[in-house]
Every structure is written in C-alpha cells, then in structure tokens.
Amino acid sequence: MCERSLTLANGLRCHLSHQPDARESSALVRVGAGSLHESDRWPGLAHLLEHLLFCGSAGFTGDERLMPWLQQQGGQVNATTQLSRSAWFFQLPAQALAAGVARLADMLVAPLLTGTAITQEAAVIEAEYQLLRHHAETLSEAALLDAAGGALRRFRVGSAACFGDNVTELQQALRLFHQQHFVAANQQLWLSGPQSLDELQQLAEAFAVRQSGGAAHSLLPAISAPEPVETLIQLADEESFWLSLFINGEESALRDNVTLLEAFWQDEATGSLMAQLRSEQLCASLQCEWLWQSADHSWLALRFSAPALSASAARRIEQLFWQHLRAVRAATPAQHRHYLQLAQQDFAALSPLTQLRGRALGSAPSADVPADFTGFIVALPQASCTRLLTQRQLSAVPYTTQGFCLQRAPWPQTAAGPIAPVNWSFYPCADVLHLPDLPVNGPPLLRANPVQPRETLLVRPAFYHTLSDEAALSWQQQLRPRLAALRHAGGSGRWQQQQGVWQLVIDLPDNAKPALQQLPGVLAALNAPVQPQPHRAAQSIVIRQLLEALPQQLLAPAAHPAWQAAWCGHSESVSQHAAHGLSEVVQTQPAPACAAALQHGVSALRCAANDQALLLFIPLPAADDASLAALRALALMFEPRFFQRLRVEQQIGYVVSARYQRVADVDGLQLALQSPSIGWRTLLQHCKAFLRDMVSELAAINDETLQGWQATLLAQCQPHQNADAASEALRKQQGLPVLTPEAVAALTLPQLQRVHQRLLRERRRWRLLINQRE
C-alpha cells in the first residue's frame, strides 16, 4: 500500500491510500464540527444536520442521492456525529468511486435542507432519542461524561421538544451552522482504493473545487479533567466495569501508544491479561474507546464486561490491569515490535471502509513502535481516573444528565486486598518449544482457488447444522488460547459467526513450521465436550436480539453437528499438513446436503425492550443459481424503496431495512422494522403492502435499470476473502445455490416477476419473529 497526504490551495487536507489488490474503494470526509459546537438554543443541531445531508443536494435528488444510489451499487454508507467532529463515509465498487465522491461533495457543499426533510428527520431523531434512553452503551457513556461537568452535561442527541415546530427558524439555524463550519480548512478527506495516487488526487481536487475557503468558527468549550468519581448505575445489559483515563499529550502520540497497548490487552494467549481475567472468571471481554480527543489531551475508556461483575471483582480487575501494565513496560523491544506487527496485521485484515474509519477516527496502528512507549506507560498511572460499574440489580436514585435518566448509586466501600504477582508472558518467548514433527500426508481436502495471498483452512458445521449458543461459546473458550498461540507463531485464526453459521477460519503461512505445529491442537478443540456457559444478557436494542435469534429460530440447533472443511491456497504441502489434523474431526467427503427443515410461522420472543420490533425472513422459493440471482436483484430494488417509504415518508420508526440475507445457509429476503409506537400486526401489514405494491413497480422496470442491477451483481460474484471462496466451493460441491456470472447475465424481468410472485404466494414458508413488549 502507498500513501500520500497533501493540503490543497483552499486548505482541504487530503489523505490518499493506493491499495492495488482492492476491488472496492472507500471515501470519508471529516468535518471539525460536532455536538459541542452547537448553541445552547439548539441541542442536537449537528446530529440533525448529519441526517439532512443525505436528504438531497443541489446536484443530486431522489434516487440519485448518495444513499439510495449507493444501495443500488451494492455499497455501504453511514455517518457519525461526535463531540467535536462529524464524519460521512462510504464503500462501493472501485469503478464507481468518482460518481460517489461527486455525490459526497455536493451534499456537503449544497444540501437542500428543505422544510419537509427537516420535519421528517426531526421525527426520526425523536424516535432515535427514545431508543437511546434505554441503550446501555449510551447511558454508560453519559455517566462517564458527566464526571467532567460543564458542556459535557448538556443534551446533545436532539428531540422533537428541542427542535420545536418552527421549521423556518430551525432551517435558519441549520444553514448558519453549515455556513460556519463546513469550509475546506475545517475538513479532511480520506480516499482509498485500487486507483493510483495520482488518480485519487484528481478525485480529491475535484471534491475540493466547490468547497468554500475561509476559517471555520470552531471554538470549543474548555474540557477539563473529570473528577475522580466512582459510581454505580443500573442497566439491564451485561454488567461492566469502566475505567476511564484522562491523559495529557499530543493526540497522535497518545493514539499510537494506546493502539499498541491494546494489542497487549487483547492478547488471549496463556499468560496474557485476558487469559488471567478469564481464568479468575472476572471478565469476558475488554473494549477500548476514546470518549474525547483533542490536540493536547484525550479521554480513554476501558470497558471490562462479564455476565456478572461485583464491586470487589472490579477492584481485582483494576489491580491486575496495573500489574500487567508494569510487566508490559518491562517487555523487550523485540516483544514491543512483535505486538505492533500483530496490530498491523489485524488492521490490514479489516475492510477498506473500516480501515479508512480507523485512520480518520483514531484506531490505526503506527508504522513503528512509538518513540517513548515505555515513558508513556510509566506516566499512565498518574492520569486522572474515573470508575463506573453497571449492575442489573441496584438500590439507586434517579439522576438526569445529558437528557438521560440514570439510576445511580455510590460505590460500596470495598477494600482492595493484596495481590500476588502474576507470571505474565509475552511473545516471542525465550523458551524453546519442542513440538512433534509434522506428518507428511493427510486425507484429501476440497480445494478452492485463492483470492488472497495466503493459505486458508475453513472448518464449519455441515450445511443446515446450526450450533446452540452454549456449544458455540464453549468451543470459543477452548479455542481462544490455542488461536492466540497460533497467531504468535505466524498464523492467525478466528472462531466467528458468519451469516448465522459458526465457523473456524485459519490462515497459515507457507514457510512457518511453528504455525503448522500449532494446528493439531487448534483443531482438537472442536472435539472437546460442551461445557455449561453462564447466561448472557440480551442486547439492549430489540431488533438486534431478534437478529441474533433468527438462525436458531429458522433451523433448530443440531444435537451432534457434523463438520466439513475446505482449503483455499496454492501450497500442497501446507494443505496436506492441515488435512492430517482434520482426520479426527471432519468428514473429508461429506454427503450432499439434505433439504433444510425450516421452521416457519410467528414466534414471540421475550426481549427487554419497550419498542416493538418485527423481523420477517422469506426463504428463497427455489434453491438454484438462477432464482438466487433473481432474489439478489429484487433486493437491490427493494432496499432503497422500503427505506424511503417506511423510514422517510411514513416514519414508522428508527430501524427500517429490506435486504437479501443468507441465514444459516438459507438464502432469503429479510425485512426488519422497529417502532416505539406501532404494534407488530400493523408493521406486518406495512411489509405485506410494500411487497404487493412492488408488483406494479417491478412491471415498470426498464432494460437500463435491470442492466444496472446486473452490473452490480456481477461485481459481487467473485469472493473477496479466501474463507468465502472455500465456503462457495463447499456449496457448489453439495449442490447449493451460489451467485454466478452466468445466472446474473441471464436475468430477465419475467424471471424476477416469477420469483417475486412466489415470495408473495408462499406465505406458509415465511418466518416471523416479534418481541413480547414489556
């Protein structure tokens, strides 16, 4: 990858990344204006403007706006409003980058900000605010920010009450905010893709042509270090201990040091911080996030989460955290470089858009170990700290901050007991590992042509075999330290749920014997008996609870799942070594997949939420390549229309989605809705009416539109990851549908109409999940 940074004549700063092997391109623009730049009269104004920029601009309206246009391209788009900055970003097929950048530039320079759009998006933000009032992460962040006082205690999300009913006055405030802050010198543009740096620079210069010059009015209220408070709040989510650190120093230096430290903190190998916390049943996961970043100080939050977490356990976690930090300081320079390389490898494996967001918003690893890494570690314990513990059951009193009502209580009096030194371990180790010689041959593996320069093994359950949550989590526990050891030996692996299917993906180098020697131990974990798992608290957003439940609600978990595997790579010797380790686990020649025994009808699930959510999954009527291509084309048509009708025009709620989805190996159309006020039967009627109305719209589709869908689908036929190529090879071997260029090229309008009619007609196959409202 090659990079270039430059500042154009009007002050726009540009960051360009040439990724020669990428098939998709991405763009992100960051504006130095966020919620803290709003006047006290208009809380939520920056958030509202974030929404409105997608609602049309001088050059692009209707279906040509960035969001619906990107959906037609099969791309992704989103935006975020933070305390001191906002960002808009997208990813799409590389050949469409110029058209996407043109739309992004136009919506930032010349948004329409019509009264109709303002009314619509103000209602959407009101629904979002009602959702966030019960969102665990939002309430936790509010409790943390409250400790700093001042402007951070002000309401920022926005609501119908704040915006009022004088649309003209609100429109004037929006235009003034836009005029003050959306100038070239207050923006930064990131572009990445297979285009050359010169081509990317030409796009950046075209983006900048219409950007206004001048200085931005971007003065921020002073943010001081938080009081060293210790607080408990009551939340229905899993329990968490938040340790926040207010750190002085230059922004990029702090970011680079923390990103490297996070590689140590997230390590799961024996002797790591996470391994120790899990062995003592103190913590299941650790997350790091920046609450605030500025030129000379930043505020870091560490979240330690578990099904249950007491105040004394939180004290123990913090003791181990500081002891581990001292051990990291004493690690060798070679070990510091090793963990930086791991962070760089993890970052390189992310999608182009996620990488771009990391570079723009502060999570990309540096090229070298920070110059004063050990000095940073020495100074970190002197940072101002706050502590927050969330509990499901708590004797609390209400406290309002930032527009949210927290159930708050003081930290109980708990004395921290003595802590014995832990034998922390870092890699590379000085100890010499004596591993057995590798076997030469193994049973044959199904082979797929690689699409990435690595050797990849995919191990997954037989088709239509879902795993219970208990089994998946049990194997995850078994695999964590083994996959971490593999990672330190030069390979990598992940146990992940992909499209509702748990699978093991292992990437191996073709010249690293230590990594190959770790492989048998990794694979043996899949033969380990399932261990009982603690109850997991549900997501606080109800539609996510339904999405998590869908795979097992569509296909009942298999009592004794069979395993299958495929290899994607060029190395014959590495493939043979991998196959040998599979002999006790995997069916090397699995039988053809049987027809899926799909569950259907309506199920009401108990969810901790006040909103009503509906998740409708309509399976593909005929499991063949031609029908799959038709379904994918229909989804391209439905996605923007469903959003426009139910989210923009009818404003039924905050979550509105229609898309193609593969769930537990079953292809289908997935409709998702969540509303604070509308019952599920009415939501279902909206879905049915939409599908019926698409009959006439589909009949009016012209050849040019169909050809556009075909072009989008053709770009999606080729897998982007080795694991996807291996999965596709298994599907082909067992006669399951895949998206092929031949099927896409042969699409006709009558074919789409036939598949659509079957989706409508075969309602007995529909799977509908709803939540039982509290």
Predicted regions and their residues:
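Active/ligand-binding-proximal structured segments within catalytic/core domains
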Residues: 18-69, 128, 253-265, 451-493, ...
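A structural supersecondary motif
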Residues: 242, 266-308, 481-496, 615, ...
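Non-catalytic accessory/assembly modules
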Residues: 116, 168, 188-191, 195-203, ...
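An aromatic/glycine/proline-enriched structural segment found at the starts
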Residues: 183-184, 188-242, 249, 565-622, ...
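C-terminal regions of mature proteins
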Residues: 339-450, 552-581, 712-774
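Histidine-acidic residue clusters that define the catalytic metal-binding segment
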Residues: 2-4, 146-188, 222, 252, ...
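A generic structural motif
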Residues: 33-35, 92-94, 188, 193-195, ...
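Acidic/histidine-enriched segments that form metal/cofactor-coordinating
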Residues: 31, 58, 63-177, 273-275, ...
